[in-house]
Amino acid sequence: MIAPLSWLREYVDIDCTPQELEEKLFSCGFEVETLEEVGAHISRVVVGLVTSCEPIEGTHLHLCEVDCGSEGKFQICCGADNVEAGRKFPTALIGATVCETNKERSEIVGTVTIQAGRLRGYDSFGMLCSGMELGLNEDLYPGAGYNGLLVLPDDAVPGADVKPLLGLDDWLFDIAITANRPDCQGIYGISREVAAVLGKELKPLLVSYREEKVAPHTLKVDVEAPQYCPRYEAHAVKDVKIQPSPAWMRRRLSLVGVSAISNMVDITNYVMLELGQPMHAFDRRDLIGDHIVVRTAAEGEKLVTLDEQTLTLNPSNLLICDGEKPVGLAGIMGGLNSEIKETTTAVVFEAAKFARDNIRRSARALGKRTDASAHFEKGTDEYTVELAMQRALHLTEELGAGTVTDESAGQNTGNSIEKRPLTVSLARVNGVLGIEVPGEAVCRILANLAMEPELEGDALRLKIPAYREDMESYQDVAEEVIRFYGYEHLVPSFLKSAEVTSGGLSERQRRELKLKETLAGGGMYEAIHYSFFSPADLKLFRYPEGSEALRAIRILNPISEELSLMRTVLSPSMANAVMRNQKAGNLSGRLFELAKVFIPKALPLTDYPDERAHLAFAFFGKEENFFTLKGALDLAARSLHVKFRYEASIEPFTHPYQTAAVYVGNVKIGYLGKLAYDIAGELNLRTDAYLAELDLETIESLPHEQVYFTPLPKFPEVQRDLALVMAKSISCDQVVNLIRSCSPLIREVKLFDIYEGAPIPPDRKSLAFTVTFRPEEKALAPEDTDALVQQILERLRTSCDIVLRV
């Protein structure tokens, strides 16, 4: 937000330089992104009194003698139509820097340095300036909008710098407001912090006004959607006179980039900038029935907004309506049918608190992000709603814009506007900080923040202002204390609540790091995602009713709907990663992610969820297939010191004939498979994608196989290829296990061919294996190998009617 120094000084006596104030703000947690002097582009421009002004014959020019006080007297040629003797104008001396305009003098195009010149045979030693040449407009300084010279007041002292006179010595602080401090979205909120950090008194906001009694009171407010609008206030003003705002208000609005419109509209904008609370003003004549209704929109309902755009709404959008029709999109923009006009004579001011998540979703969905919606998205509070209304009514009276009546209406189903008690332990506050901050210093700091501290022994009793919704615990109090006590007082210390160790990685961290290094060494890239995903992801992956994957925890204040659920599985995120890669032109790749999923013990939450480590893979591209992904899983298995077993399986989101369940022993720990064609189509994938996901937590809980040293073989291995014919219902895994069970000399059984078709009967298939024998005591003679093969064939025939293909 932009905060002019002159505006801050209205509420705090600031006696330090702008640069020192910037450092002070940074020290208490507010980063000043830019600090800029309003007239930084202007230099060596002083007040000049024209003592003589003679026309140059045959031209539009005048030859002027200009008295610039201590700077001297100068001859200057000027072509402005309003130059005359006895008047004072901004005078740019030789070497001065001013704004350069285009030929039409309609906009500033840069800066220019003034040099001595010669016009029509006359020397000119400077330039008399217009408002635009000083970077001013009519709102920043009255008269600056005139195309001729800027006329200065009669009491301006010749030779004096014009910057203080024209407000060009003001400074603009562009302050980054963190998400937890919505109370600092306005000038007054920042002034509270400035007063606290400087140890100065905060001047009160002027909010008094006189009400004129009127009868009868017909204004009504009904909030039909209190979950989206916990507080709504409306107040009537009569005898309204629509006219331009005074110069001081127009200047402040202009300094922060807001255009002045008319007094009543400017008041609402001014209050938003000052307090961070958006407001709106309705033409009361357009409120049918003198009735304001806050409700959700009907499906397909229409509203024409102030920018003359027609919006088509749905029940997720919140509306402000009169007795018959919508008159505004709540928290975002008013309706064209109730705008303030030159003929407006009665106004209803609106101040409200709207649910930030609802405003954010509506603004994004409708493409209508405004200053008001930006403020509501960050958050407002019930206390500031009332304060803003009082301030707007005070300004109405101060500007003579209308008569404040005693007619108001509203509804508050939200938080109290009174201070709320909070008691914390001073020892715990200091425990968080790791230092001992004296109780007197703690109380002084918190008193400067209007928290009315009382310290009795270790008990620190506070009264938290309603606008500080972020203050909930002793950790929050500790943050406030150290912000103003000074981070430079912090010293390294051990956590008192934790066991002191020598540091380093835990055993689990070492295993996970080794696993990541192994996978990266295998040509895979690590993917890192948010811990959230979208409800649409779960729907796309067709998880069955009752599935653990569907028991996702909804985030109360999500970044967006696409990131509104805590992840219960990683596979949807990996599929989306493939989609993003292919959209960016990367059509092949091997990705893995090691991250936690969050499984609630019960919904709604009654306890912390189980956090389980999962490992997921996504292979995509023309060179990838089921077996390249299986190889990656085998690589992971070796790193984890386990053996994976694979069985044909079905997942709701994979190809029915290219999916396997992954087991360790008899415990299923995951799956691998080819992403189903229809899901790949929904994601607009241009190649096949293969996914896998393993539950590392379950693997960790299983007994790991012991690793023994095996000496190098003394005798050569022997291999035999067997092409076997069997029923189609028999799985490869069954055959491998049968073969392995025939002899301890069998080291490996590897499938290398699958065949179906003539001359194999239609109900049978052929699987070809390479069987590797490793003798331990003596070399295998051919007849020994033949005997082992016959033993295998006999076991296969008797067990599963599997025969050798001939």
What is each stretch, according to the model?
Residues 33, 47-77, 158, 268-337:
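Conserved mixed alpha/beta core segments that line enzyme active sites in large multi-domain catalysts
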Residues 2, 20-23, 27, 448-455, ...:
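A carboxyl-terminal module marker
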Residues 198-223, 400-429:
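Terminal amphipathic helices with adjacent charged low-complexity linkers/tails
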Residues 189, 422-587, 720, 772-776, ...:
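Extended, well-folded interaction surfaces typified by the phenylalanyl-tRNA synthetase beta subunit core
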